[in-house]
C-alpha cells in the first residue's frame, strides 16, 4: 500500500530555520515542533503520530531531530513501524520498516547511540566554554528579569501579603521567576 510522505521537523530555538531540514525533499505534509528534543511530549509529534496511517512514510532530517536519547528514538521508531509506517532518516541515509532485519536494528542502535554521544559532547564543550568565559569575566549568564530595585520592591510587596500571581503579572515575569526572586536575596 503506497501512502503519503510526511515530514517531521524539530527546531530547538526560534532562530533556527525549520525549512532547511527538509529542503529538496518531496512531502505532502510537514509537522514542525519548536521544542527541545529531550521532551517526547511535543504537540506536533503527537499530531503526526495521530495523523499517519499504514503505508505512509515519515521523513526526518536526522535521528536527533526525532529524539535526543536512544530509548526514545527506538520507542518512536517501533511505534511507527508497528503501525505499518516507514521512517526515513535523510542525514543517516536509513529507512526503517516493520520488517527490519537484525542489521537494521543494529544500525538504529549504533546511529542513535552516536547521536546521543554527539549531544553529550556538545553539552560538555558548552559547559567548558562557559566556565572559561566566566574565569575571563566574559560570561555573565542571562540578563536578570528585574533590576535590583524592582526585586527589592517585589520582595517587600510579597512579604506584605500581596497575591503572588498578581505580582508576577504586574512585574511581567512568570510565577516561577517570582519564586526564584523570593528565594534569593541578591
Curated annotation (Swiss-Prot):
SMART domains: Resolvase. Keywords: DNA integration, DNA recombination, DNA-binding, Plasmid, Transposable element. The keyword DNA-binding applies. Gene3D superfamilies: Homeodomain-like, Resolvase, N-terminal catalytic domain. Residues 17-38 are annotated as: Disordered. Residues 164-183 bind DNA. One of its GO terms (biological process) is DNA integration. Resolvase catalyzes the resolution (a site-specific recombination) of the cointegrated replicon to yield the final transposition products. This is Transposon Tn501 resolvase. It comes from Pseudomonas aeruginosa.
